[in-house]
Amino acid sequence: MRILITNDDGINAPGLEVLEGIARDLAGPDGEVWTVAPAFEQSGVSHAISYTHPMMIAKLAPRRYAAEGSPADCVLAALYDVLQGARPDLVLSGVNRGNNSAENVLYSGTVGGALEAALQGLPAIALSQFLGPETEGLADPFEGARTHGARIVRLLLEKGLWDDGDYRLFYNVNFPPKPAAGVRGQRVAAQGFRRDTSFGVEPHMSPSGRRFLWIRGGAQHSPTLPGTDAAVNLDGYISITPMRADLTAHDRLAELEALIG
């Protein structure tokens, strides 16, 4: 099996090392693991692509590259340059430091990398480690993902739905904010919404007298509807959410057509 991995926390992020281990486990001794990840932090870039300027790329080691671009850029760089036309059997993005559940999905570069792979017709999974009070004291905050990651990916490869439509299905996986031994299993869950956690800005003044702003988010442990991704994570379960890039509100098309068509 040939596996391509990327992330949004950058080439030196600890979560990428976790994902490389997961990928090596999945690929086996005869497989290939290729890493093309951002040279710098790219959290919050979503599905951005850098088509207005060139993307520098450097080979760091055999099958390991750093690109000065977003996770989606890295997927494109791998498919159309690094791999020299060879197609990966699977694309994994992560393991993100922090959850990519609920509304975070819309901002996530980790999800954006998987989304781009899906648009390119490839099986893709985004993986993130929810952090919280129970992971703060751990020697390895990623131990949930490290312990259960390969099993979850195998489960999806063996039993998941992998349609090949125009907006191909991909998966968003979040590991709960628990030690590995405290993970209770996995749940298929819809994307939730935290009503009191939208982003805002926090104004400050620099020592030189210049005004600047920090973008801040809300509490990541706020509740979502029961059974949705963040809710099952907080209950100790790994959430598995099937996703597509199609943002159309299909359930409202007929109603809107009747009103204004």
UniProtKB/Swiss-Prot annotation:
EC number(s) per UniProt?
3.1.3.5
InterPro entries per the UniProt record, alphabetical? SurE, SurE-like_Pase/nucleotidase, SurE-like_sf
Q: Which reaction does it catalyse?
A: a ribonucleoside 5'-phosphate + H2O = a ribonucleoside + phosphate
* A Pfam family annotated for this UniProt entry: SurE
Which controlled-vocabulary keywords does the entry list? Answer: Cytoplasm, Hydrolase, Metal-binding, Nucleotide-binding
Q: List the disulfide bonds.
A: none
As cofactor, the record names: a divalent metal cation
Q: Name one cellular component (GO) term.
A: cytoplasm
Binding-site residues for a divalent metal cation, renumbered to this chain: 8-9, 43, 96
The main enzyme category here is hydrolase
Q: Report the subcellular localization.
A: Cytoplasm
Taxonomic superkingdom: Bacteria
**Official protein name in the record:** 5'-nucleotidase SurE
Q: Which organism is it from?
A: Cereibacter sphaeroides (strain ATCC 17025 / ATH 2.4.3) (Rhodobacter sphaeroides)
What lineage does UniProt assign to this protein's organism? Bacteria, Pseudomonadati, Pseudomonadota, Alphaproteobacteria, Rhodobacterales
Q: Which gene encodes it?
A: surE
